[in-house]
């Protein structure tokens, strides 16, 4: 009787841990962006944050959702993608509003201009929505046509996680161009690192598709590189680039 009771407790604890891990996986990905969002809102300055981070996460999570139709993976990962897309759109909305408000004579730039020089630097949030919808429509249609091809499905999954693995690269490049990490939330990067480490372990333990595990580890390496930038640029400060060059970086 005691043994049965003990087994029930162990089973309950395992279920609790599994439920907690799933919740952490679903919502943990958006937590790092909370301090960055608050910093931008408080300072009304978005120059230190690369909006290309949002672009890469939107692409990665849209592709991951499409990958799910060809290769079902755990539901928490699917919900994580949906919540991350909403979060990135909110980040883009704030960054766009702040950037336009800080420009003296903002020239209207829109998605329908199809000007590559100003890609992802449009003046209205609706243009970002149009771009995301266009990308989703095109990739969704291609996926619908090739969903029966195992090779296409695996490539789609790889592109999804590989794009997410390069998430920190735009921020890494922006910091390098500015020779500074000013304006970037260090809390965000620390949360990236801890979250990506947890995520990589989650992928391995739950036997997620191999693409997830490999690219999760790559993400951790990029996070560590950004943290090294924080140390180097604070310990050995260099002459900052001009505002014009900074704005040009990304």
Swiss-Prot record:
<dbReference type="InterPro" id="IPR052241">
    <property type="entry name" value="SLC66/Scramblase_ANY1"/>
</dbReference>
<keyword id="KW-0472">Membrane</keyword>
<feature type="domain" description="PQ-loop 2">
    <location>
        <begin position="149"/>
        <end position="215"/>
    </location>
</feature>
<feature type="transmembrane region" description="Helical">
    <location>
        <begin position="72"/>
        <end position="92"/>
    </location>
</feature>
<keyword id="KW-0677">Repeat</keyword>
<dbReference type="GO" id="GO:0005802">
    <property type="term" value="C:trans-Golgi network"/>
</dbReference>
<keyword id="KW-1133">Transmembrane helix</keyword>
<dbReference type="GO" id="GO:0042147">
    <property type="term" value="P:retrograde transport, endosome to Golgi"/>
</dbReference>
<dbReference type="GO" id="GO:0005768">
    <property type="term" value="C:endosome"/>
</dbReference>
<dbReference type="InterPro" id="IPR006603">
    <property type="entry name" value="PQ-loop_rpt"/>
</dbReference>
<feature type="transmembrane region" description="Helical">
    <location>
        <begin position="15"/>
        <end position="35"/>
    </location>
</feature>
<dbReference type="Pfam" id="PF04193">
    <property type="entry name" value="PQ-loop"/>
</dbReference>
<dbReference type="GO" id="GO:0016020">
    <property type="term" value="C:membrane"/>
</dbReference>
<keyword id="KW-0812">Transmembrane</keyword>
<protein>
    <recommendedName>
        <fullName>Solute carrier family 66 member 2</fullName>
    </recommendedName>
</protein>
<feature type="transmembrane region" description="Helical">
    <location>
        <begin position="151"/>
        <end position="173"/>
    </location>
</feature>
<feature type="domain" description="PQ-loop 1">
    <location>
        <begin position="14"/>
        <end position="80"/>
    </location>
</feature>
<dbReference type="GO" id="GO:0005829">
    <property type="term" value="C:cytosol"/>
</dbReference>
<feature type="transmembrane region" description="Helical">
    <location>
        <begin position="212"/>
        <end position="232"/>
    </location>
</feature>
<feature type="transmembrane region" description="Helical">
    <location>
        <begin position="49"/>
        <end position="69"/>
    </location>
</feature>
<feature type="transmembrane region" description="Helical">
    <location>
        <begin position="118"/>
        <end position="138"/>
    </location>
</feature>
<dbReference type="GO" id="GO:0045332">
    <property type="term" value="P:phospholipid translocation"/>
</dbReference>
């Amino acid at each position: 009787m005691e043994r049965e009771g003990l087994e029930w407790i162990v089973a309950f604890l395992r279920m609790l841990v599994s439920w907690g891990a799933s919740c952490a996986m679903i919502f943990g990905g958006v937590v790092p962006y909370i301090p960055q969002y608050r910093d931008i809102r408080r300072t009304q300055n978005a120059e230190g944050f690369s909006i290309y981070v949002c672009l890469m996460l939107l692409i990665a999570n849209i592709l991951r959702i499409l990958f799910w139709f060809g290769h079902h993976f755990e539901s928490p990962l699917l919900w994580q993608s949906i919540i991350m897309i909403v979060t990135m759109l909110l980040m883009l909305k704030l960054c766009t509003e702040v950037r336009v408000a800080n420009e003296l004579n903002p020239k209207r730039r829109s998605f329908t201009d199809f000007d590559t020089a100003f890609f992802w630097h449009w003046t209205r949030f609706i243009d970002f929505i149009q771009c995301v919808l266009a990308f989703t429509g095109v990739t969704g249609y291609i996926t619908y046509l090739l969903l029966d091809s195992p090779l296409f499905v695996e490539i789609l999954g790889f592109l999804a996680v590989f794009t997410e693995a390069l998430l920190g690269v735009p921020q890494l490049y922006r910091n390098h161009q500015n020779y500074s990490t000013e304006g970037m939330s260090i809390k965000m990067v620390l949360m990236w690192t801890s979250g990506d480490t947890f995520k990589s372990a989650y992928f391995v333990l739950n036997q997620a598709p191999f693409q997830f595990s490999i690219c999760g580890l790559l993400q951790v390496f990029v996070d560590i590189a950004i943290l090294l930038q924080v140390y180097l640029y604070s310990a050995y400060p260099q002459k900052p680039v001009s505002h014009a060059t900074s704005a040009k970086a990304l």
